[in-house]
């Protein structure tokens, strides 16, 4: 979209009621300092440009795919997450852009999405990063991991949430935390290990944040050596992963999202991620443009 002129985008928008923004990058894509410039370029600047074009041609509503880290930031102001994590700050700025775009004839809705499982044909799942982390502990009789948990949903459910938000007749701005399932990390990892062919009985040992922070020292040094500014503070991540970052699914059900097989979706994601990690398949990675 960044390669198209305003006039070309207007032609694409004409005759439509809703604009859906499902583009951009998340915290797992690496950028040099200052990382905020890249989050603005890929996640936020397109909205500042396209919203006025939407209004010009009569589009009435926009649905933007955001992050549940914005939901966490608002839920836990005591943690100072915006100050420590550029990605969180960028997602909050994205919601402000959406909020400020609202008028009597234009509404906006941000779907604050958690971890998503399932596969898209030809696209590399983000979970190859998890495979890399776990491989380092494969020779141990147990896996060390934080004690918290996360909200989640499947690819199919994301599509249903988008469709529900698109036809939702609600004026103004709203940010909806979206999830259908909540799962502790230890239960999640047992599904992961079974998907990797290592059986369902892998021992998972929960660790305190301070222990994980020790492991982050090397990662922080690696970032510095390579000139990378992480979107998430490596020394704040253990505190975040120690939380039960759960979401009540009542909001998601209001969008018309139906039940799905989350364990099968996790299994599919991990199997494709493992195949990608092993070099058995070539897939398209996440990128800004």
Language-model-detected regions and their locations in the chain:
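NAD(P)H-binding glycine-rich loop region in Rossmannoid oxidoreductase-like domains
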Residues: 1-45, 49, 71
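Conserved Rossmann-fold NAD(P)-dependent oxidoreductase catalytic core, especially the SDR/UDP-sugar
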Residues: 45-91, 109
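Conserved beta-loop-beta element that borders a ligand/cofactor-binding pocket
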Residues: 98-122
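Glycine/proline-rich active-site loop of Rossmann-fold NAD(P)-dependent oxidoreductases
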Residues: 118-131, 165-176, 198-200
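A conserved pocket-lining segment of Rossmann-fold NAD(P)-dependent short-chain dehydrogenase/reductase
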Residues: 132-153
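Substrate-binding strand-loop-helix patch
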Residues: 149-156, 175-195, 209-214
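Terminal hydrophobic/aromatic helix or amphipathic segment near a protein terminus
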Residues: 189-245
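Amphipathic terminal alpha-helices
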Residues: 242-289
């Amino acid at each position: 979209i960044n390669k198209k002129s305003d006039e070309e985008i207007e032609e694409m928008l004409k005759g439509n009621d809703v604009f859906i923004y499902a583009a951009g990058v998340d915290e797992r894509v690496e950028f040099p300092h200052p990382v905020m410039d890249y989050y603005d370029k890929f996640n936020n600047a397109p909205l500042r440009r396209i919203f006025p074009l939407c209004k010009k041609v009569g589009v009435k509503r926009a649905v933007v795919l955001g992050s549940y880290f914005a939901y966490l930031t608002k839920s836990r102001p005591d943690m100072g997450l915006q100050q420590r994590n550029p990605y969180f700050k960028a997602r909050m700025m994205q919601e402000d852009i959406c909020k400020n775009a609202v008028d009597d004839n234009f509404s906006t809705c941000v779907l604050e999405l958690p971890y998503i499982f399932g596969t898209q044909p030809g696209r590399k799942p983000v979970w190859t990063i998890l495979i890399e982390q776990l491989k380092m502990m494969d020779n141990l009789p147990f896996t060390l991991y934080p004690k918290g948990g996360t909200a989640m949903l499947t690819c199919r459910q994301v599509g249903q949430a988008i469709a529900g938000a698109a036809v939702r007749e609600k004026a103004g701005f709203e940010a909806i935390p979206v999830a259908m399932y909540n799962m502790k990390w230890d239960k999640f990892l047992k599904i992961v290990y079974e998907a990797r062919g290592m059986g369902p009985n892998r021992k998972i040992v929960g660790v305190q944040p301070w222990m994980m922070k020790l492991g982050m020292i090397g990662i922080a040094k690696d970032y510095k050596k390579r000139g990378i500014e992480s979107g998430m503070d490596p020394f704040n991540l253990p505190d975040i992963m120690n939380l039960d970052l759960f979401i009540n699914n009542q909001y998601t059900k209001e969008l018309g999202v139906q039940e799905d097989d989350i364990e099968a979706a996790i299994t599919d994601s991990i199997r494709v991620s493992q195949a990608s990690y092993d070099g058995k398949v070539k897939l398209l990675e996440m990128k800004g443009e």
